[in-house]
Amino acid sequence: MRPLRSIFLLVAASCMAVAQEAPVPGLAVLPGAVNGAFIERNGKLLAVYGDPSGNRPGAGMVLITHARRDVVWAARSLLAKGAKAVVPEKEADLLVRPEKFWGEFREKRFHDYAQRSTKVPIEAIRPDRTVKEGDTLEWEGLSIRVLETPGYTRGAVTYLADLGGKKVAFTGDLIRDDGKLQDLFSLQDAIPSARIGGYHGWAGRLGDLVTSLGKVAAERPDVIVPARGPVLRDPRAAIDRLLARIRSAYSNYLSVDALRWYFKDGHILVKAQRVLGPDARVDWMPMAETLPLPDWIVPISNSRLLLAADRSGLLVDCGGAKIVEELKKMRAGGKLASIGEVFITHYHDDHTDALPLLAKEFGSGVTACGSLVDVLERPGDYRLPCLTKNPVAVAGKRRDGESWRWKEFKLTIHDFPGQTLHHNALLVERDGGVAAFFAGDSLTPSGIDDYCLQNRNFLGEGRGFLRCLDIVEKLPAGCLLLNQHVGPAFRFTPEQVARMRETIRKRTLLLADLFPFDAPDYGLDEGWAALHPYSVAVAPGESARLALRITNHSPRERTFRAAPRPPEGLTAVPAGPVRIAARADGEIGITVGAPPGAAPGVRVLAAGVAWEDGELREWVEALVEVRE
């Protein structure tokens, strides 16, 4: 076998990559979209993560820290050349049987409240061995210990080895750079100890990640080789910085957390203490004033009925059959004459599932504006939380800010990207009476509703909740705020609105320190890159078009490229690079083809996205059905 140094020179020449200086004797790290770490011993090679160049002649073994396809792709070339794979026991099923996950996910992506990241592998990896906490691998006289370090994923591990008199930790995506995280959306999860489900668990595995960082710190490694980013030569300082950044950002988040209204202080303190420590206290914003609903607003489950003087009705949202049944009872009892229109605040299934039934019973037309319209009409084209399977035609396609008269009311619709990016709000001003603002699920008396990161909550002036607060601040004096999951109406004081605004602005700065990107939204918004439509069908001998949709969150124009990786039996050809202005959207077309004779069935197509100074391999996916 060639000496390690000469091999790396060969790799560098062939792929224009340069290996970092070896952090310790016998260890070399090849940087890339994922790092490749190589240990040489007795003329043999062991790899951690894999080979980002794809040009290595081989290795005897590959250690995999976690089951993310945007990481494990780097191991594929070595495994094809005969390397044996070692994988975490708790994530082995995702690696060994990814087809099981994807087979179920075709339906589970609808009504999805679990919010597991979809960066699940697509191609199976057959491990030679699985490992768990306390295991030791023996390789060429080298003992490699295993720590379970969940956080970035549910079952990740860290590998520890003494090399050249130095303790080296291979920590996967647990930490990177000088104490940063790759993102927070990958940590969305349930928090069982606080009785909080996956949908409500904003970065729910932060508590696990904090514990895992403590375990790694207790080992006192001299060097950390992460899956991404530079080698860490002062691990203790980097871990301390990351812990401080996490706790500052989490404290900020909790201080205006809408979930406090629903779950009360005790549950929120449980999740706070997992991250902030056992003595944690939260500097909560005071609760907003609550007020009774006026008699012309009728609560029906999580819908609200506006009742005009002539007994005509306008409904806000319709998520369940029981709502329609109650409306039928009101009609039969003479309290309700008709419902000609239903306004939709957002696409979540608990607000939209029964719209077809409502239309059948009352002939009600749907009203919405902005990006919400397409999600309502084509929910299956999206990968978003809480999707309904029931598309509806939007008869009343309004413009943001448009006003119109309905009976004795003036109505004004707003694009209101709060709880979700695809969200509307409705200002209702009754002639001679109080005004009411239907904010959907975006606000509660305790603050802002951004607890599901997959909903796409943007930071920055004029975006996300800052845009929403701008609208709230301009509402008529005394205007009531309504969230249909909250019984009473409520009002924020000017001081509360100012506090929420300043909290979000501070959060922007805190997260800029936490993430490795030039805009913190890349670490919050999993949907900044997505294949659209999420599910397509193609016949053998034909093709279909996908688009890699990209939101350039950066403060400057960027050029993006698509790198599709079609599954066996399909082709995928991307269009050329696209230049997208700062904080704007763009897309790259991808033509997906099925050759004549292609076997029927559903396949998963992944695509990477790259820009001037970054790359994420196999980052997005779409489901492609080959029809019979």
Regions found by a protein language model. Give the residues of each.
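Conserved beta-strand hairpin/beta-sheet module of binuclear metal-dependent hydrolase folds
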Residues: 20-56, 158-172, 176-177, 281-331, ...
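Active-site HxH/HxHxD metal-binding segment of metal-dependent hydrolases
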Residues: 27, 52-136, 322-405
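Metallo-beta-lactamase
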Residues: 45, 136, 143-236, 241, ...
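Low-complexity, acidic Ser/Thr/Pro/Gly-rich terminal tails and inter-domain linkers that flank the onset
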Residues: 509-539
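Asparagine-centered strand-capping/turn motif at beta-strand->loop junctions
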Residues: 550-554, 594
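Short acidic, flexible loop segments centered on an aromatic residue
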Residues: 555-569
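Short proline/glycine- and polar residue-rich coil/turn motifs
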Residues: 578-586
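Short, surface-exposed loop/turn segments at beta-strand-coil junctions that are enriched for proline
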Residues: 593-599
